[in-house]
């Protein structure tokens, strides 16, 4: 089972729509695919990122590990709600339990790469999506990261910092996806489509137009095939 961890340079850069587009792309390649969201915050039951992915793609193989009420980092939201933090080993075991069921697992993070998602007992610390990727990589899984970035002014620095954090941990990154690219792009947005791969030395795999999350399932499945280079 190949595992792709979808992270972002920040919150609200388009990770969920990018993950949905990856679902369609993998399905078009004939792959069986599932999506996991370790921690969802700030959404009532029946809504959230996995619900959006289901709406856009029709995919039913969706796994959410924990949900916390306030739209904050998962560790903070859990603490404020007075509930247990998401346990690292539990998430790893849920992923291991999917082995053999799917050819490809997409794991969508929360916010950026180093957002604290929960607690790890050994060693005792808070854990991030980077920690999860490192653990899966060490277990021999074919693991890669994808970085979803905005294209607005300031995106180059945010993307470079995220890439540097992955390289510092020797974690493989397959490339970048430009999320929610404006229809009427300004100068910075236009230039960043060229500059992002130049400064990160990673390919820009797709450019997703803003408003794509409002498409119907059929519209999304058709349109998303045109976004990848």
Name what the model sees in each region.
Residues 91-125:
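Switch II (G3) loop of P-loop NTPases
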Residues 120-151:
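Inter-motif core of Ras-like GTPase G domains
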Residues 5-19:
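Glycine-rich phosphate-binding P-loop
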Residues 17-100:
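N-terminal phosphate/diphosphate-binding loop that engages ATP/GTP or pyrophosphate donors
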Residues 35-37, 146-149, 172-180:
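Short internal beta-strands
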């Amino acid at each position: 089972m190949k595992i792709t961890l979808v992270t972002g340079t920040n919150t609200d850069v388009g990770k969920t729509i990018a993950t949905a587009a990856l679902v369609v792309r993998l399905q078009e390649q004939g792959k069986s695919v599932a999506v996991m969201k370790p921690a969802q915050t700030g959404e009532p039951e029946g809504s959230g990122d996995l619900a959006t992915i289901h709406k856009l793609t029709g995919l039913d193989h969706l796994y959410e590990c924990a949900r916390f009420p306030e739209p904050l980092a998962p560790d903070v939201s859990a603490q404020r709600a007075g509930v247990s933090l998401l346990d690292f080993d539990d998430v790893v075991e849920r992923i291991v339990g999917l082995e053999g069921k799917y050819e490809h697992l997409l794991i969508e993070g929360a916010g950026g790469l180093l957002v604290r998602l929960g607690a790890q007992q050994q060693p005792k610390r808070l854990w991030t999506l980077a920690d999860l990727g490192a653990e899966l990589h060490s277990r021999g899984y074919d693991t890669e990261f994808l970085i979803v970035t905005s294209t607005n002014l300031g995106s180059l620095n945010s993307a470079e910092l995220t890439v540097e954090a992955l390289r510092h941990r020797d974690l493989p990154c397959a490339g970048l996806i430009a999320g929610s690219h404006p229809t009427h792009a300004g100068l910075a947005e236009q230039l960043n489509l060229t500059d992002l791969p130049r400064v990160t030395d990673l390919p820009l795999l797709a450019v997703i137009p803003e408003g794509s999350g409002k498409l119907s399932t059929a519209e999304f499945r058709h349109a998303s095939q045109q976004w990848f280079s």
